[in-house]
């Protein structure tokens, strides 16, 4: 059998004439004590809370719920597991302060960075600061596009080194900067990653 899931409102409504086996409804996002949360209901009444923000994480949770149902895992066990579950490096909340949120995410291309920053904008942050770099010996086109995305969607961007491999880190930053320069976004270059993170605080 094939079972399906849907995030109501993700594409307006479910496909005409079709009804998903499980639908996330009344989806809300919140911030509490330096963490971001996703909150939703299924079957009109079952309530779920995730420590991972964003529609894409709600979709992932629905897939997990369906698999758990297939194996007849108790709903309370599923709820508890989803509420506690995090994925290292994927919208990972790092608790530092109650006054701001610090997330680590493996956004390695323009699309993933755009989705991430768009999701974070949905939380209506007072200020959105992004620290990122691009890996060496990989597509150079990606670098400028990521710089442009950060410049458009973040309030402030800190460009830094990220595994330069055999390339000069400063030349990689030049490529990223070529994209961000065409936006109105404020930014700074700090090649040393540890210093870049320290600067953000």
Enumerate the language-model features and the residues they cover.
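Extended acidic/charged loop-beta regions that coordinate divalent cations
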Residues: 1-47, 85-94
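Nucleotide phosphate-binding/pyrophosphate-handling subdomain across enzymes
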Residues: 32, 44-156, 178
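Generic structural signal for helix capping and beta-alpha/helix-loop junctions
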Residues: 12, 85, 138, 166-167
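Short, active-site-adjacent cap segments at secondary-structure transitions
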Residues: 1, 137-138, 166, 196
């Amino acid at each position: 059998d094939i079972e399906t899931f849907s995030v109501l409102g993700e594409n307006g409504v479910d496909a005409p004439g079709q009804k998903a086996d499980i639908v996330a409804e009344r989806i809300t996002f919140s911030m509490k004590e330096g963490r971001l949360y996703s909150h939703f209901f299924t079957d009109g009444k079952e309530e779920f809370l995730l420590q991972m923000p964003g529609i894409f994480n709600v979709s992932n949770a629905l897939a997990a719920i369906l698999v758990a149902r297939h194996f007849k895992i108790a709903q309370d066990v599923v709820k508890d597991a989803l509420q506690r579950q995090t994925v290292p490096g994927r919208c990972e909340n790092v608790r530092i302060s109650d006054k701001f949120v610090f997330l680590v995410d493996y956004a390695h291309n323009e699309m993933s960075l755009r989705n991430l920053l768009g999701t974070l904008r949905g939380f209506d942050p007072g200020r959105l600061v992004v620290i990122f770099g691009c890996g060496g010996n990989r597509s150079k086109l990606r670098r400028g596009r990521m710089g442009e995305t950060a410049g458009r969607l973040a309030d402030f961007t800190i460009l830094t080194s990220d595994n330069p491999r055999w390339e000069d880190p400063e030349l990689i930053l030049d490529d990223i900067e070529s994209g961000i320069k065409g936006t109105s976004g404020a930014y700074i270059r700090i090649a040393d990653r540890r210093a870049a993170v320290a600067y953000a605080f």
